[in-house]
Amino acid sequence: MSEKTGGEKLLYCSFCGKSQHEVKKLIAGPSVFICDECIELCNDIIREEIQGVEAAKLAKSDLPVPHEIRQILDQYVIGQEQAKKILSVAVYNHYKRLRTLAKSADPDEIELAKSNILLIGPTGSGKTLLAQTLARLLDVPFVMADATTLTEAGYVGEDVENIIQKLLQKCNYDAEKAQQGIVYIDEIDKISRKSDNPSITRDVSGEGVQQALLKLIEGTVASVPPQGGRKHPNQEFVQVDTTNILFICGGAFDGLEKIIRARSEKGGIGFSASVRSQDNRKDFGAVLRGVEPEDLVKYGLIPEFVGRLPVVATLEELDEAALIQILTEPRNALIKQYQKMFHMEGGIDLEFREQALKAIARKALVRKTGARGLRSILEAALLDTMFDLPSLENVAKVVIDHTSVNGDIKPILIYSDKPKVAKSC
């Protein structure tokens, strides 16, 4: 809309009717004009509608139910059935709670508290893999932290808020996305208090770190320097609310079973005395399943920290059969990975005989490294073969026996008369 006054063409907003002198900016279109105030109003209307649609989508989005979560975990993690069930329920409830918060505007509605998770199990039992698989399944930001590198703020070492900084980096400093992520803190047992009694001296890497983690795990607004770096008084910070971040803590807790036994098994003399089991390895998992908060406090975690981790899942020590399953059954099993790698070397087949798989599993048991040690055993067994194969012609198949795993003889090479298949790029 326009009109001439004193030789000057006066322009008006086509929506609100204000003149160009009454507004800051007037934008022209084909025979129409819109002012900055109307643009801002339109943006507000669109923003509200988009937020409403996104909240509805979030509420209706396909959050897998515990049974479905368990089935997906089964594809990657062998055994640990009870731990998978506990994790499936805990993670489902956590993200169901977030979806309820997204669509709820009633201030009087019952507030659902967050339940963080503690995983207890020996090295190589699958604690880290469970957390990684859950994050991948739910498509949320995931970050791992090592508790042994953490210290209190002001001391040499890694500040606990650095964990949130890593989470922000994973999602390109999108605070909203980071606030729905998963943080896995490994080796949490290594920050246990050195004795039952509070120390007179400062314990900056033990009880001090537990105190520093308390608020972060429970829920606080962490101030993180943008794009990393150290904090400076005059710089702007990215504010991240940790209330809805799911924290999963894991640790081996060596010696915890002794504390549980001491509490649960009664000593005595005569006919009424309880007989203590001498086969500690056999019922190791059963003992750990009986863990109580008081046992964790006795181990060295402060009561407030134990209280922030209400969901406790214990993982079994892996036996020979479980290790063989780990080698062969999961979607990304190690044997499948090496078979694919050999097939890339001109279509060569790689076969592991049953005795070879047993030998690999036994080696891992001797090393007490669980599933984590399987790859290094395979690398050692296949090193010479992987070194020689690219220089050999017409190899069709490589067979691995228990003697190859033990280092007695080299793997068996089966040759073909046909020329080698060209390598794929």
From Swiss-Prot:
The organism's taxonomic lineage, starting at the top: Bacteria, Pseudomonadati, Pseudomonadota, Betaproteobacteria, Nitrosomonadales
Signal sequence interval, chain numbering: none
Residue span(s) of domain ClpX-type ZB: 1-54
Family: Belongs to the ClpX chaperone family.
InterPro entries on file: AAA+_ATPase, ATP-dep_Clp_protease_ClpX, ATPase_AAA_core, Clp_ATPase_C, Clp_protease_ATP-bd_su_ClpX, ClpX_bact, P-loop_NTPase, Znf_CppX_C4
Organism of derivation: Nitrosospira multiformis (strain ATCC 25196 / NCIMB 11849 / C 71)
Subunit structure: Component of the ClpX-ClpP complex. Forms a hexameric ring that, in the presence of ATP, binds to fourteen ClpP subunits assembled into a disk-like structure with a central cavity, resembling the structure of eukaryotic proteasomes.
HAMAP family xref list: ClpX
Name of the molecule in the record: ATP-dependent Clp protease ATP-binding subunit ClpX
Domain of life from the UniProt record: Bacteria
Statement: the UniProt record of this protein carries the keyword Transport: no
Binding of Zn(2+), residues: C13, C16, C35, C38
Residues reported to bind ATP: P122, T123, G124, S125, G126, K127, T128, L129
UniProt key word Zinc: yes
One CC-aspect GO term: HslUV protease complex
GO BP term, pick one: proteolysis involved in protein catabolic process
Pfam families tied to this protein: AAA_2, ClpB_D2-small, zf-C4_ClpX
GO MF term set: ATP binding; ATP hydrolysis activity; ATP-dependent protein folding chaperone; protein dimerization activity; unfolded protein binding; zinc ion binding
Entry keyword set: ATP-binding, Chaperone, Metal-binding, Nucleotide-binding, Zinc
Physiological role: ATP-dependent specificity component of the Clp protease. It directs the protease to specific substrates. Can perform chaperone functions in the absence of ClpP.
